[in-house]
């Protein structure tokens, strides 16, 4: 269930999800990638940001809910592959 104060973004490549602090709530892999594709969610605003807070492997479709991981410096999705991903955040 998505509450009213949540935001949603879908992507297939590296994406800045939020430019300042936020909380990653859920990840939905809506179209699988191939092989060892993955999405690394980084605490920052670009692909060189550290640390990696969370990694989701996208070789299969799936729903990952109730993550509630807090990012202090932004949420950046560093994508490896061509899976389609939808993220719920606040």
Regions found by a protein language model. Name each.
Residues 61-69:
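Exposed aromatic-hydrophobic patches
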Residues 51-59:
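Solvent-exposed serine/threonine-rich low-complexity stretches and specific carbohydrate-binding patches
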Residues 25-27, 68-81:
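Noncatalytic modules at the cell exterior or secretory-pathway interfaces
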Residues 1-21, 32, 78-90:
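C-terminal interaction-tip segments
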Residues 43-44, 56-57, 78-79, 88:
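Beta-strand-rich, repetitive solenoid scaffolds
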Residues 34-51, 86-88:
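Short, surface-exposed beta-strand/strand-loop-strand elements in extracellular ectodomains
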């Amino acid at each position: 269930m998505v509450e009213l104060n949540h935001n949603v973004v879908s992507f297939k490549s590296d994406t800045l999800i939020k430019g300042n602090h936020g909380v990653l709530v859920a990840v939905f892999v809506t179209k699988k990638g191939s092989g060892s594709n993955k999405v690394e969610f980084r605490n920052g605003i670009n692909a060189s940001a550290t640390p990696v807070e969370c990694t989701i492997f996208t070789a299969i479709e799936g729903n990952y809910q109730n993550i509630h991981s807090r990012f202090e410096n932004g949420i950046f999705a560093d994508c490896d592959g061509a899976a389609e991903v939808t993220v719920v955040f606040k």
